[in-house]
Amino acid sequence: MSIKSSRHGGDVFGLSEEEQDKVFDFSININPLGLSPKGRAALLAHWEKETLRYPDVECRALKKSLSIRYGIPEESMALGNGATELMYKLLELLHPKKVIVPAPSFSEYRLSAEAAGCPVDSFFLKADQGFALPLEEIEKKLLRHSLIYLGHPNNPDGQMLSPSDFEAVLRLAKEKESFLIIDESFIDFVGDDVSYRHVLVNETCGAVVMSLTKFYAVPGLRIGAAYLHPALAERLQDTLIPWNVNGLAQSYMTAAAQDIDYIRNSRVYCQAEREKLSAAFDALDFVKVLPGSVNFILCRLIGRYQTAEELQEVLMPYHILIRQCGNYEGLDETYFRVAVRTEEENQILIKALGAVEN
């Protein structure tokens, strides 16, 4: 079995369907509990109707459900075919003079800026400093009429943006007539009270962009949300193509956003499994676990294996796929990331790592 690496992890689609079913894909950060029961029921009940008709171009039922779930007015949101579409459209709309992005971080921050024809610069989050935000460097690089991306939590290190750092960057954005985009695609794994969406919907210099496919486990359906000032939400919505959120995605998310038991259980489960995985990795003599707070773990090789590619090769007989992180700006080939999956799958990973330790 051979799997090519893509810019977002392993590409399993080059395998046969039979081989795909054998892979334990720890390179993708999706809720291990799978579909929301309420969302699944909605899909089963409405799949034929939603397939045979055009979706609601205004996403009315979904916006109402998300408004109830997250406490954000419907007029302060725009919905897209995943968070990535909204990032690209925001950059097209705002067209800042310069974009600065964290390194390491989600590659689409830089790519969305390049697609909009904007110059891009990086500021570095250093592992030996706990991936702390370098506020002095940001202040120097954030020019007037620029844009800054921040992850909260950041991918791949899982670090949260502290309230004091958020306030400092927001103040800089205001002073320099610039714009702040916070990517909260993994925030649901942490909790509602740590989000900054309630602040930025009242500001004209910022937005929260959020993938709904990670926590609600529907990457194949594709859906994302932007939370921002109503005037800007309207402008962003006008840039989106009609019917960009399909009917099945709308039906599923409308129900899943109200599945309170699923939301609570997912957080508890992922946190418990993360702690067990971290403890097991700490017991290995060739892996250093970096602290984080979300449903994935960033690690560094410190012994037997020189690169994550080498580790991936020895894990292939176990049908295990990890995320090699050498293509993240600011990380080298000793870094890799693993998602928190089911208890059974996590145990398979732990046993495999133990087997290749010696």
What are these regions (language model features)?
Residues 1-53, 144:
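N-terminal "arm"/small-domain region of PLP-dependent enzymes with the aminotransferase-like
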Residues 5, 92-150:
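PLP-dependent aminotransferase-like
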Residues 34-36, 205-290:
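PLP-dependent aminotransferase class I/II
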Residues 67-89:
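Short loop-beta-helix segment that forms the pyridoxal 5′-phosphate
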Residues 73-77, 98, 184, 204-205:
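Short acidic capping loops at alpha-helix termini that bridge into adjacent secondary structure
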Residues 121, 127-188:
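Active-site phosphate-binding strand-loop segment of PLP-dependent enzymes
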Residues 164, 317-318, 329-358:
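PLP-dependent enzyme catalytic core of the Aspartate aminotransferase-like
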Residues 271, 284-318:
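Conserved PLP-binding catalytic core of the aspartate aminotransferase-like
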